[in-house]
Amino acid sequence: MACSPLEQFAIIQLIPIHIGNLYFSFTNSSLFMLLTISLVLLLVHFVTLNGGNLVPNAWQSFVEMIYDFVLNLVNEQISGASSVKQRFFPLIYVTFTFLLFCNLIGMIPYSFTVTSHFIITLGLSFSLFIGITIVGFQTHGLHFFSILLPQGVPLPLAPFLVLLELISYCFRALSLGIRLFANMMAGHSLVKILSGFAWTMLSMGGILYLGQLAPFFIVFALTGLELGVAILQAYVFTILLCIYLNDAINLH
């Protein structure tokens, strides 16, 4: 298990907490989620302290860049009045920032990638999906069920299409969680495997010492690629969240 590329995803119990038959132990996953939230809050606090700087520094520019990026994303993907967009912007901004920092912190050696665990991504996607569904019913009432039946469908095909649309709608949350988990886990595992291969060749010495340069270059390239994937997956999760929210609000 020591050489397994999956060892990096192991849940380690740090503080055991048992209340009867309930298990609330504080793990490395809990620690890094807490660190992520603390880092984001501290960054935003110091950047916005005293209203921020008239001439922004690097950190303030970084926070403003994320803010403008998410704001443009919301304006492009969610149609309707600006009050509707402002209502859901904080949720989308927090979701994107949390996922982005979780993914980036997972790139640091000896850290833990929170989003590489299916239970985390699935819990996040299902909670958001349930919230979006509630928004749909609050906005449209029972008319929200019309999202399951496209206009102009022949009556004999209606039951079949409603069933297909219902399955498709329910699988949105599942696919949202699987996509993030699978990409983060696969990328980190690949980097770990190639890193171990390059280190083995380096340790053997001799002519293999020169041969290990190619795997090392590949590892560096994959690390850069994985960094891009970490940012991209936070973006994909967020844009799909905006699309699903727009469907619930406008029945598109």
UniProtKB/Swiss-Prot annotation:
State the UniProt keywords alphabetically.
Answer: ATP synthesis, CF(0), Hydrogen ion transport, Ion transport, Membrane, Mitochondrion, Mitochondrion inner membrane, Transmembrane, Transmembrane helix, Transport
Question: Per its UniProt record, what Pfam families does this chain match?
Answer: ATP-synt_A
Name a single GO cellular component.
Answer: mitochondrial inner membrane
| Claim: Transmembrane is one of the keywords in the record | yes
Give membrane topology per the record.
Multi-pass membrane protein
Q: Mind telling me which SUPFAM superfamilies this protein's record contains?
A: F1F0 ATP synthase subunit A
Signal peptide: which range, if any? Answer: none
For whether the record's keyword set contains Iron-sulfur, the answer is: no
* Residues passing through the membrane, by range: 6-26, 31-51, 88-108, 117-137, 144-164, 190-212, 225-245
The record's listing under CDD domains reads:
ATP-synt_Fo_a_6
Q: Fetch the Gene3D superfamilies from UniProt.
A: ATP synthase, F0 complex, subunit A (1.20.120.220)
Describe the family membership recorded for this protein in Swiss-Prot or TrEMBL. Belongs to the ATPase A chain family.
Subunit structure of this chain's protein:
F-type ATPases have 2 components, CF(1) - the catalytic core - and CF(0) - the membrane proton channel. CF(1) has five subunits: alpha(3), beta(3), gamma(1), delta(1), epsilon(1). CF(0) has three main subunits: a, b and c.
Function recorded in the entry: Mitochondrial membrane ATP synthase (F(1)F(0) ATP synthase or Complex V) produces ATP from ADP in the presence of a proton gradient across the membrane which is generated by electron transport complexes of the respiratory chain. F-type ATPases consist of two structural domains, F(1) - containing the extramembraneous catalytic core and F(0) - containing the membrane proton channel, linked together by a central stalk and a peripheral stalk. During catalysis, ATP synthesis in the catalytic domain of F(1) is coupled via a rotary mechanism of the central stalk subunits to proton translocation.
Q: What is this protein called?
A: ATP synthase subunit a
